[in-house]
From Swiss-Prot:
GO terms for cellular component: cytosol. This is D-alanine--D-alanine ligase. The lineage of its organism: Bacteria, Pseudomonadati, Pseudomonadota, Gammaproteobacteria, Pasteurellales. The gene is ddl. Pathway: Cell wall biogenesis; peptidoglycan biosynthesis. Its EC number is 6.3.2.4. It comes from Actinobacillus succinogenes (strain ATCC 55618 / DSM 22257 / CCUG 43843 / 130Z).
Length: 307
């Protein structure tokens, strides 16, 4: 068996999803980190070269840093399984499932794990939407989001029943399934998992009302506190919850799980990122750094976990 450093490694980056730019940035950082440690790593953009040809081109392993649809939704993973190349991150089923926020949440709910109360709307049911009834059940404000778009695209905070319809219509432009969720007014945090190690939680403090695309990728005024201050008991509770959430959907390798707290301080699971960002702004490397992983060593560890 060749050692990892003797293998030709493809770093999959770019792609065609709305998060292409983020993936190009993450990919460049990962590529540098691998090359600086003596790996034979090469950038491959599926936009320019079919992933199905990787084996013919002599590649032996894949570091997947594609974000969003086409890269994080099981499609690429299926191609890699088909041609028999080991790759980083989650497998086909988990990647497909976690791309769909609604189905992920239903699964967690089935396992008895805490999620936000929500109403599910489809293109068909949107026609008979009853804003007053939804507000009566879930209260105000509400969060409206497409089920399958990443990077906070298509999100709206709704403050009154009469604005619900237009928020749903906006979200339906990005997906056929839309979630209307109770507003969680507590803290926003994200917890990375590396192999079977839960890394310190990062608290996200956006300057606006919630963590949108601007706060994620552009603004320098979003504050990140890592590790997030909490008691040991509270951290144990969060760590166990994240581990159960990770295992319930079948994650492997690495993932990042977003969590919020409600007005009473109870944790609620939000979503899973199976290919977290790896840019200078990204939260996974920020968290890993607090327990001694340099960016280079983190990238190497993710590669070592590839199957």
């Amino acid at each position: 068996m060749k050692s990892l450093k003797q293998q030709k490694i493809a770093v999959l980056l770019g792609g065609t999803a709305s998060e292409r730019e983020v993936s190009l940035n993450s990919g460049a950082a990962v590529l540098d980190a691998l090359r600086s440690q003596g790996y034979d790593a090469h950038p491959v953009d599926p936009k320019d070269m079919p992933v199905a040809d990787l084996k013919q081109q002599g590649f032996e392993r894949v570091f997947n840093i594609l974000h969003g649809r086409g890269g994080e939704d099981g499609v690429i993973q299926g191609v890699l399984e088909q041609i028999g190349l080991p790759y980083t991150g989650c497998g086909v089923m988990t990647s497909a499932l976690t791309m769909d926020k609604m189905r992920t949440k239903m699964l967690w709910k089935g396992f008895g794990l805490p999620i936000a109360d929500m109403e599910i709307v489809t293109k068909n049911t949107a026609l008979s939407l009853e804003p007053q009834a939804i507000v009566a059940r879930l209260g105000l404000p509400l969060m409206v989001k497409p089920s399958r778009e990443g990077s906070s695209v298509g999100l709206t905070k709704v403050d009154s029943a009469d604005k619900l319809k237009s928020a749903v219509d906006l979200a339906l432009k990005f997906d056929d399934i839309v979630l209307i969720e109770e507003w969680l007014s507590g803290d926003e945090l994200t917890v990375p998992v590396l192999g079977d190690e839960v890394l310190p939680a990062v608290q996200i403090v956006p300057e606006g009302e919630f963590y949108d695309y601007n706060a994620k990728y552009i603004s320098d005024n979003t504050r990140y506190i890592c590790p997030m201050p909490m008691s040991d008991e509270r951290w144990d509770e969060l760590k166990n919850l994240v581990k159960r959430a990770y295992e319930a959907v079948g994650c492997r390798g690495w993932s990042r799980i977003d969590v919020m707290t409600d007005s009473e301080g109870n944790f609620r699971l939000i979503e899973v990122n199976t290919t977290p960002g790896m840019t200078s702004h990204s939260l996974f490397p920020k968290s890993a750094a607090t327990v001694g992983y340099s960016f280079e060593k983190l990238v190497e560890k993710i590669l070592e976990l590839s199957v």
